[in-house]
Regions:
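Short, glycine-rich nucleotide/cofactor-binding loops
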Residues: 188-190
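Membrane-proximal interfacial segments on either side of biological membranes
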Residues: 1-170, 174-182, 194-246
Length: 246
C-alpha cells in the first residue's frame, strides 16, 4: 500500500532522539507499505532544519528495507539517505554536508561545531559493519577526553578543549553492532593539535571500554625533528614551519 506524506513542516526532534536512543516503536509499520514523502521543512530542533525533503521509504515486517531521501540545508548544502537490500544484505548510507544538527544530539558530546558526515553500514541478520567519517570539525567539550588529557599531564590541551575547542581534520570509526554491543575496531582522529587512535566496545546502558593512543602534535614534531636533515624538512626550524607545523 502506498501513502502520500506531504506537508509544510514537521518537527522531527523527538523522533530523531528516539532513534538515537533506540526506543522508537516500529509496530505501526507491520505491513508492506511505501511512503512517498514531500515536506517543505523538517526541524531537527529549535535552531536547525532542512528544506524540501523528497523521496521514498519502503517498509516490510517492521523494517525499512529500501529508501532514497534528499533534502537541503538553508545554504543549499545537502542531506542524502539511502537504503538498499540485496540477497539478505542491507546497505545504509547517510551523508550530511552539515553534521552539527545530528551529532550534537548525542548527549556525551557537547560544543560540537561544523563538519560534514559520511556513514556507510552493511547489515546481515542482526549484525552490522559500519564506517563513520566526519571531516573538518571542532570539539569544545568532551568530558571523557578532557579527563584523560588532564590525567596525562596535558593540561594545556585540556584547557583548549574546554575553552575555544580543539579542531580535527578527520575522524573515522569502524565498528560492528550486534544486539546491545558495539565493537569498535578502530577510531582515529587527526588534528593540528592532537591525534587519537582507539579501539574497544560499548554495551548499551552498561559498560564502555576504550583503549588506545593519544599524541599531541608537539610530541610528533619532537620525535620527527630529532631525525637529521629529514626532521628539519618535515618539522621546520621554527614554530608552524614544515609539514607537521603547529
Amino acid at each position: 500500500k502506498v501513502y502520500q506524506v506531504k506537508g509544510k513542516s514537521f518537527n522531527a526532534n523527538q523522533l530523531i532522539q528516539n532513534l538515537i536512543d533506540n526506543t522508537e516503536d516500529k509496530s505501526f509499520i507491520n505491513k508492506n507499505i511505501k511512503l512517498d514523502l514531500a515536506i517543505e521543512k523538517i526541524f531537527f530542533d529549535n535552531e536547525n532544519a532542512i528544506n524540501d525533503l523528497k523521496g521514498e521509504l519502503y517498509f516490510r515486517n517492521n523494517e525499512l528495507y529500501k529508501g532514497d531521501l534528499k533534502a537541503y540545508f538553508s545554504n543549499d548544502k545537502e542531506l542524502k539517505f539511502t537504503v538498499t537490500s540485496n540477497g539478505g544484505t542491507k546497505v545504509t548510507t547517510l551523508f550530511l554536508d552539515e553534521a552539527e544538527p545530528l551529532v550534537k544530539k548525542y548527549k556525551f558530546i557537547k560544543g560540537y561545531k561544523g563538519g560534514s558526515l559520511d556513514l556507510y553500514s552493511s547489515k546481515i541478520g542482526n549484525k552490522s559493519d559500519s564506517t563513520l567519517k566526519i571531516y573538518d570539525f571542532k570539539l569544545k567539550e568532551l568530558p571523557v577526553l578532557t579527563k584523560i588529557l588532564t590525567l596525562a599531564s596535558l593540561q594545556g590541551i585540556a584547557d583548549i578543549l574546554s575553552g575555544e575547542g580543539i579542531g580535527f581534520d578527520e575522524f573515522e570509526m569502524n565498528f560492528q553492532n550486534q544486539g546491545n554491543k558495539i565493537t569498535i575496531e578502530e577510531i582515529y582522529a587527526i588534528g593540528p593539535a592532537i591525534s587519537i587512535m582507539m579501539s574497544g566496545y560499548v554495551e548499551k546502558n552498561k559498560v564502555i571500554s576504550l583503549r588506545g593512543t593519544l599524541v599531541p602534535a608537539t610530541t610528533i614534531n619532537k620525535a620527527i625533528g630529532s631525525i637529521p636533515v629529514l626532521g628539519k624538512i618535515l618539522v621546520g626550524s621554527k614554530t608552524g614551519e614544515g609539514v607537521f607545523g603547529v
